[in-house]
Amino acid sequence: MTTAIPNSYRSGPDERGHFGIFGGRFVAETLMPLILDLEKAYADAKADPAFQGEMNSYRTHYVGRPSPLYYAERLTEHLGGAKIYFKRDELNHTGSHKVNNVLGQIMLARRMGKKRIIAETGAGQHGVATATLCARFGLDCVVYMGAVDVERQQPNVLRMEMLGAKVIPVQSGARTLKDAMNEALRDWVTNVHNTFYCIGTVAGPHPYPMMVRDFQSVIGQETRTQMQEAEGRLPDSLVACIGGGSNAMGLFHPFLDDPSVEIFGVEAAGHGLTQLHAASIAGGRPGVLHGNRTYLLMDDDGQIAEAHSISAGLDYPGIGPEHSWLHEAKRVTYLSATDDEALDAFLLLSRLEGIIPALEPAHAVAKVMQLAPNKPKDHLMVVNLCGRGDKDVPQVGEILRKRAKQS
């Protein structure tokens, strides 16, 4: 299928939440009134200067924005091509980009009078950000997390509990992010009157993909300004990792209508694209999951396939619907990096720049290691460093110990 190239890549979604054939709102009847209320509340808040002003104040004084745009001099020298900059969203309060979105949604929940917040989480970063903002505003917080992720992301589980959240391990399915989202949706259907569902990525039923994108777009907006200050022009390329794709959409969206800017999204290729992986664009096809139509990993019978990634935050069998549309419109190039490539990038960045990245953005760095050497030295490449690696140190340490024993 070919997608017509629009006048603007930034005009979506339409009033029903569609990006071309993707998106929409496929939800239970009991949820539809809530979804429509949320859409109206968000439109009102977006048009309210007081809401925007309060959010900007918290961004500055609580989150710590703007995050720096950092020239990675040693990595640039090592790779011998493009000049590499990192957008350092791992320096935000809570350690990732997730707080950008959660701040906006929790402020919206308060505006709507909701006292109980639920969230799903994979790596735990969205859960930590949600627990943090709930603590700040005195709201009840319940976080659903796959039991496998609870085991591999223990530091974040402890952080959530210390912040006062109730963490519920999900034992169904593959016990990872998809299953956590299923349980959160079940909770929401049961508790519609007092509960706000804070979705962590650019997925779910409309208006969530649009809303999360808007809250995350501060990343790309700052990058435009900072790159003009640093280099006097726009970057030549952008690179970001993709699970659901909120950090990537936050960086990409403000640049979509700049044809001179190449854009690369990096999915998780896991053990390889012919084996277990989480690369929905590379290995999936359109279907419906969690309230929206998008590219999904499916078996021959159309059932959702199990995803795999070394990174809990990319371990999801789908991708945000706007990414699916940008893929078909050929505005963004979607690549993938394996577990081993991400691990090598994790170690390289730690040792060259003194920055321990999360395993999620390590996938983006892995592709930079392949892309940058083939670019001229005046090519400006911006990479979204969307999370810090504290949560992954125990897991990576265990992998390295096993490697050492085998060698």
From Swiss-Prot:
According to UniProt, the name of this protein is Tryptophan synthase beta chain
Q: Which reaction does it catalyse?
A: (1S,2R)-1-C-(indol-3-yl)glycerol 3-phosphate + L-serine = D-glyceraldehyde 3-phosphate + L-tryptophan + H2O
Q: Which UniProt keywords apply?
A: Amino-acid biosynthesis, Aromatic amino acid biosynthesis, Lyase, Pyridoxal phosphate, Tryptophan biosynthesis
Chain's gene name: trpB
Keyword Lyase assigned to the entry: answer is yes
Q: Provide the E.C. number(s) assigned to this enzyme.
A: 4.2.1.20
Tell me the HAMAP family matching this sequence: Trp_synth_beta
Alphabetized SUPFAM superfamilies for the sequence: Tryptophan synthase beta subunit-like PLP-dependent enzymes
Q: Which domain of life is it from?
A: Bacteria
Read off the PANTHER family from this record. TRYPTOPHAN SYNTHASE, TRYPTOPHAN SYNTHASE-RELATED
Q: Whose protein is this, by species?
A: Bradyrhizobium sp. (strain ORS 278)
Described by its record, this protein's role is as follows: The beta subunit is responsible for the synthesis of L-tryptophan from indole and L-serine.
Q: Which NCBIfam families match?
A: trpB
Provide the Gene Ontology terms for cellular component. cytoplasm
Q: What are the names of the required cofactors?
A: pyridoxal 5'-phosphate
- Name the InterPro entries on file: Trp_synth_b_CS, Trp_synth_beta, Trp_synth_beta/beta-like, TrpB-like_PALP, TrpB-like_PALP_sf
